[in-house]
Amino acid sequence: MSKPRLLLAVCCGPGATVAVDRLAVDYDVTCLFWGDNLDSQEEFNRRLEALYLLTDKVIVHPYHHENWEVENCARCITLRLQNAFEYVQKLGFDYFATSLTTSPHKNATLINQIGASISDRYVPSDFKKQDGFKRSVELSKQLKMYRQNYCGCVKP
């Protein structure tokens, strides 16, 4: 029997490492790379290249930073999860999740509340737990991934 298909919303390769590893146990994982919040096309490209070092199962949402006017993290998270759910519906995925909870700087409770408010097809997570963030650092170094030192968001 085949695994359910899950679309994982990601913004960088390092954050996706542990998420893909853990989710792949129960799901057929495809990554959705979305980076409208990123401050430049160059940063978008560097992060996308890093993700391809992890997996080739990637859907790339085109970069549209020119319309970016988000003022806080909660709104950014909401937009990226709404966008992911649109892809889920359009492409027939069973579930969706996000790798954002890998970061020690992100509030997993808030992220999961937002995801659950969008759809019951959202799979909650806190990938930083059980040394997830530490493991993501190790894996990204092994894969020689670009590791950014900021979320990429430029507030207006």
Give residue ranges: language-model regions.
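Nucleotide-activated chemistry modules centered on ATP-dependent adenylation/adenylyltransferase
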Residues: 1-156
